[in-house]
Amino acid sequence: MEHHKHDTFLGGIVKALGLVFGDIGTSPIYTLTVIFTLTQPTIDNVYGILSLIFWTMTILVSAEYAWLAMSLGRKGQGGEIVLREIIMKLVKAGRLVAFAGFLSFVGVSLLLGDAVITPAISILSAVEGLLLIPGLEGLSTGALVAIAAAIAIGLFSVQHKGTDRVASAFGPIMALWFGTLAVTGAVSAFSMPQIVEAINPLHGIAFFRDNGLAGYFVLSEVILCATGGEALYADMGHLGKRPIVRAWHFVFVALYLNYLGQGVFAIAHPDAKNLLFGMVRSQAPALYIPFLILTIMATIIASQAIISGVFSIVYQGITTRLLPLMRVDYTSRQIKSQIYLGAVNWSLMVAVIFIMLVFRKSENLAAAYGMAVTGSMTITGIMMIIVFSHTTKKWRALVALVVTLIAAAYHVSTFSKLPHGAYWSIILASIPFVTIIIWTRGQRTLYRALKPLDLETFLISYEQIYAKGPIRGTGLFFTRETDVVPPYVVHCIIRSNIIYERNVFISLMISDEPLGVETELIRGIGPGLDAFRIEAGYMEMVDIERLLKENGIQEKVIFYGVEDISTRNPFWRFFSVLKKLTPNFVQFHKLPASRLQGVVTRVEM
């Protein structure tokens, strides 16, 4: 994942607008509209809600992500998997590591589940703007869903081509989008300048006082203004910290100006169906259609950023052995971090369209949205408390605690959405979560069941067989570690006497750093036996074939183990099916098929 050090001050900000802020940037399309369908837009309520929005964005985006989380990068990388790796390095062992690991599993699963709902609500809400065009008022809900689904299908269908060619346009389009949000909001707010007083937190407190428990549950809708805030930290590796934080200052002002404008419009037009579209149409009817086109483009860019983010999260999960191996294609020759995972892409597309068909309207989706986001924010907060409490900046742990308690309060408020479909967040997140749990446990159990042989014992038999006369050429054998020998190698060399003039044990170890590749060739472990260790960061795209050539290893044949799992346990059966459906190690690393030789080992689990 490259840092773009050559970007200008403005260039870095514009790029960040296109890559990072799409999700949070499209929140004004539906946030206040949804809130004021549930809460009467009286002057007091509008002031209270606008105050809550300001402080929600300040605490849960500016403080939690732009300040606290972004101070915890590893070589510029961010995200919950990175936090997990930081904790594992700081804490080393014990229950805290296991707890942090479990939290990261839940956090990653929530983000992946959320990646289904976010494109669905963004695209649907934009398409619903067609209803304000004269002559299109009668469009049925089914027609709107069909248009939204067609846009989603088009977006997912071009993923395999990569976004290299069009990505340069994302930033300027989103800059225009945020500029438009700021101007339209400011124009509306100008008719009632005192609306700026909504920043005062006393208005938010008064809202809770006047509305009681119902006021608290409104937080489950207010949080919609901060969805996508986690992208600041998760996407840090693409651009670096500074351009993202600088861009956030502009985005914050643009978003809040628009919310202020919508608040004024809501007071004057309490029956408006969509506050953003209604406000823009009332200001400049002739420019409404161009604005709607810009809105749809912004939601497509936001969805694209989410899809790319999912590819990145899943790749991190694969390399850190949380998720099964999947076919990975590189869509850019210049930027190695631009990847495409077909299985993830099509699964995500089916899930997004399914959610559109289930909920049919953006307001229905909004009623179910927010549980995963607030859960993820709470988990990030807990993990930051663990990290800061183990560093010299322990005072930050107290700040993180306050932020986490606030995030948790929002999360609890979203439980009121369960009857309205929020359970879909749990269902969607449970799919990656169950996969992670079964895959990680299955790998550990399988490794123990394989009973690898220690190197010293193996060498006694190896030396005797080598003395009888090896086959010409070089044979490569993939092993998990260089000091233990897996059963398939024992079967190959000791039992079947398949031994070459040069035999190389290759092990790929994942380091606790995100980037960097180091290799070590250990010669003469035994007669004609070398070991080749590769240690790579968990964000690295490792080209094993290139590394072999660089170290003068010219293979004749590549051996690898294939486990034939026998089990009655339903969990391990699912694990076995996952292993069969997904590529094996050598296929994942695209090693030449003509030289591959799989050796089957039967394993009881």
Swiss-Prot record:
Q: Which cysteines bridge via disulfide bonds?
A: none
Q: Which domain of life is it from?
A: Bacteria
Q: Which Pfam families match?
A: K_trans, K_trans_C
Biological process (GO), any one: potassium ion transport
- Compartments where found: Cell inner membrane
Q: Which UniProt keywords apply?
A: Cell inner membrane, Cell membrane, Ion transport, Membrane, Potassium, Potassium transport, Symport, Transmembrane, Transmembrane helix, Transport
Q: Does the keyword Membrane apply?
A: yes
Listed under catalytic activity are: K(+)(in) + H(+)(in) = K(+)(out) + H(+)(out)
What GO molecular function annotations does the UniProt record carry, in alphabetical order?
potassium ion transmembrane transporter activity; symporter activity
**What's this protein's function?**
Transport of potassium into the cell. Likely operates as a K(+):H(+) symporter.
Supply the HAMAP family for this chain. Kup
Q: Which PANTHER family match?
A: K+ POTASSIUM TRANSPORTER, OSMOTIC STRESS POTASSIUM TRANSPORTER
What is the similarity comment for this entry? Belongs to the HAK/KUP transporter (TC 2.A.72) family.
Q: How is this protein named in the record?
A: Probable potassium transport system protein Kup 3
What species was this sequence derived from? Geobacter sulfurreducens (strain ATCC 51573 / DSM 12127 / PCA)
**Gene behind this protein:** kup3
